[in-house]
Amino acid sequence: MSSARSPYLRFGLIFAAVAFLLDQVTKWIVTVPLSLEPKGQIELTSFFNLTWAENCGISLSMFASCTDTTRWTLVAVTGIVAAAVAFWMTREQAKGDVIALALILGGALGNIVDRVRFGYVVDFADLHIGDFRPFMIFNVADACITIGVLLLVARALLLGEKAGQADAKPSVD
């Protein structure tokens, strides 16, 4: 990460906004027009259902108690993480890393909005093979965060120091 302003910052912020909006719009579609109710389910295919889940905690049901203390602690912690990711994005010179950070930022903000509005995060995407469910029920924000983290890890492992050099904007002297 450089101390110079990222040449991809505007792009990253737009990308984060799109991720955030996709998350919020899909949650609205599932809860309002489709009228999916808490603990309700709509079977779309043999491997994908829309299943309403109210997630008071974080992944794998950690911190799942639905208390005000848990709610506001998770809002604060997620807000701090989102601020750190946004700051990192302002300095990141590699376009691929900015995309990954934007996904994480947009997803984090989407889940923060849910937690502030409802006290829980609305999850609805239920991928399964018969009765086998390899994933927890999730939402677009969760998918964005996961994909963003995996992109950062993959780029760090596969490209290493070359990541910033490979897709950074060339400087004009």
Curated annotation (Swiss-Prot):
Enzyme class label: hydrolase
Q: Which Pfam families match?
A: Peptidase_A8 (PF01252)
Give the positions the UniProt entry annotates as the active site. D123, D142
Its pathway is: Protein modification; lipoprotein biosynthesis (signal peptide cleavage)
Gene Ontology CC: one annotated term? plasma membrane
| Superkingdom, natural source | Bacteria
Q: What biological process terms from GO does the record include? A: proteolysis
Localization? Cell inner membrane
The protein's UniProt keywords, in alphabetical order, are:
Aspartyl protease, Cell inner membrane, Cell membrane, Hydrolase, Membrane, Protease, Transmembrane, Transmembrane helix
InterPro entries named among the record's database cross-references: Peptidase_A8
Annotated GO MF terms = aspartic-type endopeptidase activity
Keyword Transmembrane tagged: yes
What EC number(s) does this enzyme carry? 3.4.23.36
Membrane-crossing residue ranges in chain numbering: 11-31, 69-89, 93-113, 134-154
- According to its UniProt record, which reaction does this protein catalyse? Release of signal peptides from bacterial membrane prolipoproteins. Hydrolyzes -Xaa-Yaa-Zaa-|-(S,diacylglyceryl)Cys-, in which Xaa is hydrophobic (preferably Leu), and Yaa (Ala or Ser) and Zaa (Gly or Ala) have small, neutral side chains
Q: How does it sit in the membrane?
A: Multi-pass membrane protein
Q: Establish whether keyword Mitochondrion is in the entry.
A: no
Query: Which family, according to UniProt?
Result: Belongs to the peptidase A8 family.
Give the matching HAMAP family: LspA (MF_00161)
Matches recorded under NCBIfam families: lspA
Q: What does this protein do?
A: This protein specifically catalyzes the removal of signal peptides from prolipoproteins.
Which named protein is this? Answer: Lipoprotein signal peptidase
- Which species does this protein come from? Sphingopyxis alaskensis (strain DSM 13593 / LMG 18877 / RB2256)
